[in-house]
């Protein structure tokens, strides 16, 4: 068996759990590769002397991996998908952060669930992801990535609104007068889009949602569309530039640049343990439908 491990930060409260995970994997003679920068953090903060194999880019991985552990919060998981892309490696999120909505398990559950994971007693939850291109082409490395949650455009260096002209499959939809616009996947519907009044969409829905950010229009409401729709955006405003984000990655574009957003031709597989489900997570972590009468 072969496992990849990725993390962004090394928190003192997670040290024992990282050590525990590595020890349990070593006891089972499992081949482990750790992302290079995270391995350096482990060596400098933990009394782990073993020199693990490492990786630093998508090109160094392949589909021979059985599992990919992400240690951290939701932000860590969002960044990890760009190491996996179309390799179909199942992701196991180990939450060492706060809410950890996307995580498979909490850090305290490592020992109790590891055998279940290694024996593959789980199902997979495929998640759609987004790609983006620009015209004229931007060579910012941000645009070579994929987004699991959302792609958003927003104003930059101004308190004035921007205007976001929007087309769906080359058919004009409308021009949003707002602070920005979010194009969200079902996975991202519980994130930024939700904060801006968007609906919750189950991960298996073949949909995307377009959610305006603080629109100055009583008729501008979130819109659910088919996920095979090609979305084209063009921003204008008092400033010359605007921001574009792909999950946690941000870049600057000149106004009037065409932004083309599509669903990627592959999905990212999240591990779902027996007894777990999106609806259970929705109730437990976001307190969905919380009512003292229930």
From Swiss-Prot:
Stored InterPro entries: ATP-NAD_kinase_N, ATP-NAD_kinase_PpnK-typ_C, NAD/diacylglycerol_kinase_sf, NADK
GO cellular component, one term: cytoplasm
Biological processes, Gene Ontology terms: NAD metabolic process; NADP biosynthetic process
Gene Ontology terms, MF aspect: ATP binding; metal ion binding; NAD binding; NAD+ kinase activity
Subcellular location: Cytoplasm
Keywords assigned by UniProt, alphabetized: ATP-binding, Cytoplasm, Kinase, NAD, NADP, Nucleotide-binding, Transferase
Active site: 74 (proton acceptor)
Role played: Involved in the regulation of the intracellular balance of NAD and NADP, and is a key enzyme in the biosynthesis of NADP. Catalyzes specifically the phosphorylation on 2'-hydroxyl of the adenosine moiety of NAD to yield NADP.
HAMAP family for the chain: NAD_kinase (MF_00361)
Protein name as it appears in the record: NAD kinase
Upper classification of the organism: Bacteria, Pseudomonadati, Bacteroidota, Flavobacteriia, Flavobacteriales
């Amino acid at each position: 068996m072969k496992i990849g491990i990725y993390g962004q930060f090394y928190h003192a409260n997670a040290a024992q759990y990282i050590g525990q995970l590595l020890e349990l994997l070593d006891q089972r003679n499992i081949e482990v590769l750790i992302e290079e920068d995270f391995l350096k953090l482990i060596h400098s903060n933990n009394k782990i002397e073993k020199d693990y194999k490492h990786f630093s880019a998508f090109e160094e991985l392949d589909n021979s991996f059985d599992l990919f552990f992400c240690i951290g919060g939701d932000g860590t998981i969002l960044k990890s998908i760009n190491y996996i892309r179309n390799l179909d490696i199942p992701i196991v999120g180990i939450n060492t952060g706060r809410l950890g909505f996307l995580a498979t398990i909490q850090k305290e559950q490592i020992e109790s669930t590891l055998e279940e994971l290694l024996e593959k007693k789980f199902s997979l939850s495929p998640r759609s992801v987004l790609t983006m291109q620009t015209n004229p082409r931007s060579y910012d490395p941000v645009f070579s990535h994929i987004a699991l949650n959302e792609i958003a455009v927003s104003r930059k260096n101004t308190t004035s609104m921007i205007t976001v002209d929007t087309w769906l499959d080359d058919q004009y939809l409308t021009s949003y007068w707002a602070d920005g616009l979010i194009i969200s996947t079902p996975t991202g519907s519980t994130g930024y889009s939700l904060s801006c009044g968007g609906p919750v969409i189950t991960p298996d829905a073949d949909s995307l949602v377009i959610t305006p950010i603080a629109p100055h229009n009583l008729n501008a409401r979130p819109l659910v569309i088919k996920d095979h729709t090609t979305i084209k955006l063009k921003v204008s405003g008092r400033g010359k530039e605007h921001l574009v984000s792909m999950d946690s990655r941000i870049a600057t574009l000149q106004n009037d640049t065409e932004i083309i957003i599509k669903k990627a031709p592959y999905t990212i597989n999240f591990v779902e343990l027996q007894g777990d489900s999106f609806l259970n997570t929705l109730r437990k972590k976001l307190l969905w439908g919380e009512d003292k009468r229930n």
